[in-house]
Amino acid sequence: YQDYMAVGGDKALDNVVGFSKKVWSSWAPASWELFSKAVPKLNQLDDVGEVEEGTFSVEKVLSLKPDLLVLADWQYEMLGSDLDAINEAGIPIVVLDYNAQTLDKHIKSTEIIGELTSQKDRAAKIAKEYKDIVEHIQTTVKNSKISKTTKSSTWSLVVVAQLNKG
């Protein structure tokens, strides 16, 4: 959600009619509280349920009469035959993939959001900044004299680094 809003800017939600609200509000309550206060429209959008929890409602999506449906790659894969009704209704499906954690897929997903929200320039700027940061980190790590590999993980990020203990 934050990616979509970051690229789309102030008008990111102007054409949004529904989203998986509960997953954001229950899985990341502090983030939800901040965003829903700053962007009150979030509270007005319909909740279409969550794919991973099995609450995603194709009927709810169809009732909203969307021009298109935006899904993460993993959501698209999990929905399987549930997508048939959406396809039969003629609703195009746009698949984004930030979860693959690759530079190319992040940039492509950002560009797609820029296209969807009429924010191509903003998307290009964000993609370039992201690419520059990733390349800077890769160069810094490559050029460092680090000797030991350490792995640390959190719920949304895996960091692999080498620590110089000498």
Model feature map: region roles:
Residues 81-164:
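Extracytoplasmic substrate-binding proteins
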Residues 74-76, 99-100:
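Short glycine-enriched loops at secondary-structure junctions
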